[in-house]
Amino acid sequence: MKTMHFFSACIVASAVTCTTPLPRRDSMIYLLIISFTFLRGCAVFTTARKTLPKGCLLEIAHSLPRHSFFSYINNGSLPSSYFEQAEKTLQDGYVYLILTESKSASSELIGLFTNRQYNHVSLAFDRDLNTLVSYNGGERIASPGLNPEAVTQLTQRAGATMMLYRLPATYSQKRAILDKIREINQEGSAYNLLGLLFKVTLRPNIMFCSQFIYTMLEHAGLNYFEKDAVHVTPTDFIELDYYRTLDFVGKIG
């Protein structure tokens, strides 16, 4: 019965995608994502008796037309006040990594592929997380891509939790990350939904969350494990920390 519900949801999701005006070169990719998600969902259900929550796939399908696989559609989402605030933290000796179980539709979808509890990762320059940033879907407020985040936003759903870690970083390393984020903010960005499923990147500033975080750490010489950024998952930052480079700070939620 659950398999039939999943199948029905996929059909409706495909119809939604087909009837929504889309860039011509993107339309087949949207349908490919729906088809791939359906096949993967059936496989997961068969092996683990797990499927997406009711309405989850429809929510994802409705958001698909907001994405672009070829163009930068997010520009200037981080205001000057963000950079001013981040500048004040460059001397504190750490960058902060935050893993989130947000209970959102996208998080549940990613969980089908990672089989992990925490499916989003963010970066902040300060302990109070006032400079929280990552790649996300924009929550229907901003365009998918590089966006500021807030603890209240990430933990608004029942059962959502966050795990906070800190990574030692020099002034110059934090500066390198901040300057790179500023560059992306000016050039533009988009969320790498295609790469999330097929592990490809079509343009440099089109990334998903863990790809972005790893790219920033690597840019500053702070990556403490070696992996192609497009293959990095949020929990890799914990599971591949063989030398205990991170310090656990606390749990939120």
Language-model regions: role of each:
Residues 1-253:
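Cysteine-nucleophile amide-bond enzymes
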